[in-house]
Amino acid sequence: MATKKATMIIEKDFKIAEIDKRIYGSFIEHLGRAVYGGIYEPGHPQADENGFRQDVIELVKELQVPIIRYPGGNFVSGYNWEDGVGPKEQRPRRLDLAWKSVETNEIGLNEFMDWAKMVGAEVNMAVNLGTRGIDAARNLVEYCNHPSGSYYSDLRIAHGYKEPHKIKTWCLGNEMDGPWQIGHKTAVEYGRIACEAAKVMKWVDPTIELVVCGSSNRNMPTFAEWEATVLDHTYDHVDYISLHQYYGNRDNDTANYLALSLEMDDFIRSVVAIADYVKAKKRSKKTIHLSFDEWNVWYHSNEADKLIEPWTVAPPLLEDIYNFEDALLVGCMLITLMKHADRVKIACLAQLVNVIAPIMTEKNGPAWKQTIYYPFMHASVYGRGVALHPVISSPKYDSKDFTDVPYLESIAVYNEEKEEVTIFAVNRDMEDALLLECDVRSFEDYRVIEHIVLEHDNVKQTNSAQSSPVVPHRNGDAQLSDRKVSATLPKLSWNVIRLGKR
């Protein structure tokens, strides 16, 4: 077996930016079994007195997710937030047109805020700009963030929440460019309502940050024109523009599939260019950052979802079971987000529990980790600090849709406070190991703490509630001498090489 070689230089002064911890965010929508039967299952042996599953809470805490987007998603475009507050017995059952389900409203924003506190996350709250508009948006900010002395803040207090929730980050609707969206709008229609909603929301609470909707994915016919038009209307009043993108391996072409993170990289660069064009056009001193608030692999469950009966409570929708190659692509996508730490400040793995998720649950049964759980956990836990620009020389390959795909996808993160450097690396090679030589000349007296590897001989291998064949091991061979790290990256592997001060 031939071993290819790649080299990399990491230098503590080659800084991209401090990584905003919110890029390791996630998403919970009122969809399928994400809420009901996911985070919330009264009567489950692991449920607390409020019905929240403690086993799920522990798995989420292990991921150290700093921010969670809620309550949607397509769901939010038909959602009346008032339905989910106040006495539970008085809450209406509603038809959710987005997912053709019945919403009981047993869980609403106050219960979700309680749960988010338990897992140590802040909430990225979305407002409904589909069936509703600026009035409901300002009232929701008042209910959540105003201390007291007004109708909606006093209503929150009457509901048992004396202290305001102080939600900092808000989404101005969801995927309004999509014809599937409840209340779909043109770019001009959406740009106008988003601008007016942004103004009144910030008048209620000037400390909040706002995310305006970009395109639902890069293949939308209105992509780029949508962003330019929407930002033209909203630039002075918003802080972020959103990106959404999901990938799948429908053609069963692993080499091409693992190169899709290059498309993600190009998507990010394109949106940065559009935002900066509007900045130049407006002669603005303000820079708009990016919120990649839906990203993941999503394709396994597409056919099964067509067979689900409509108008039931918490049907098993979007329950992708992820395999090993999915974990590798998720790793490449995480590295791509880190590489753009200067502009991507928020990102949400969509979603968190049961719905295209790293965590799965069974009714009255266990919770378990999917293959994609591990790269996400490693990135979140060890990817805090400054992203360093990697100078890489790697052998390359061509695939169906891409040319010059590097076998090595890698980045290093420097945590000055902990005096640690973490190298994240994916070897895309399907046949051979890759010998990595990494020059760490600016890091004196460092040693290898550990070399974590996620590998498997079968790219289609999945985990289940009964067994977890795809799990990382700590038997990587990384060594450091003469300020050079050398490591073997097994074929098709996700690697985390942690360096610390002696």
Swiss-Prot record:
BP GO terms, sorted: arabinan catabolic process; L-arabinose metabolic process
Catalytic-site annotation from UniProt: 175, 294
UniProt keyword Ribonucleoprotein, yes or no: no
Activity control summary: Strongly inhibited by Hg(2+).
Positions marked as site (Important for substrate recognition): 298, 351
InterPro entries membership: Alpha-L-AF_C, Glyco_hydro_b, Glycoside_hydrolase_SF
Pathway this chain belongs to: Glycan metabolism; L-arabinan degradation
pH-activity dependence text: Optimum pH is 5.5-6.0.
Location relative to the cell: Cytoplasm
Family annotation (SUPFAM superfamilies): (Trans)glycosidases, Glycosyl hydrolase domain
Thermal activity profile: Optimum temperature is 70 degrees Celsius.
EC number assigned by the record: 3.2.1.55
Keyword flag Hydrolase: yes
Stimuli inducing this protein: Transcription is repressed by glucose and by the binding of AraR to the operon promoter. L-arabinose acts as an inducer by inhibiting the binding of AraR to the DNA, thus allowing expression of the gene.
Self-association state and partner proteins as the record states: Homohexamer; trimer of dimers.
Family: Belongs to the glycosyl hydrolase 51 family.
PANTHER family: ALPHA-L-ARABINOFURANOSIDASE C, ALPHA-L-ARABINOFURANOSIDASE C-RELATED
Main function: Involved in the degradation of arabinan and is a key enzyme in the complete degradation of the plant cell wall. Catalyzes the cleavage of terminal alpha-(1->5)-arabinofuranosyl bonds in different hemicellulosic homopolysaccharides (branched and debranched arabinans). It acts preferentially on aryl-alpha-L-arabinofuranosides, and is much less effective on aryl-beta-D-xylopyranosides.
Protein name: Intracellular exo-alpha-(1->5)-L-arabinofuranosidase
Organism (species): Geobacillus stearothermophilus (Bacillus stearothermophilus)
